[in-house]
Amino acid sequence: MKKSILFICVDQWRWDCFSFMKHKNALSPNLDKLAEESTTFTSHFAGIVPCGPARTTMLTGLYPFIHRSVTNGAPLDKRFTNIAKEARKIGYDPKLYGYTDTSWDPRYLDPEDEKNFTYESPMEGFDSVCHLPEGNPV
């Protein structure tokens, strides 16, 4: 049986603002429990800002000057792979809860495809399970 993989990427949370990271005022009991059974990364950096290009860098493993998706909404060249596409090749079914702030390569889409008009589509390879569009209150 394959191991399950839960990859959590959050937007604008400081790494040190959790009680499991020894912050003196932060209380994060549910995340603390998850962290006890997880791998946490304490020595990393964002390759670029803003968030969409940073996620693209993280999910493709490519430097921004290679993937060239350097602003929110910039399409990712379809020739590049990502963690979801690679996971599918070995039998996983990647699900996305949230958003990636990437847009699909328009050269491979029908001109009327709705993916041409938004950057809120999930990155190719992911199935979107739960998506909260920007600007909509919870």
Predicted regions span which residues?
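Formylglycine-dependent sulfatase
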Residues: 1-138
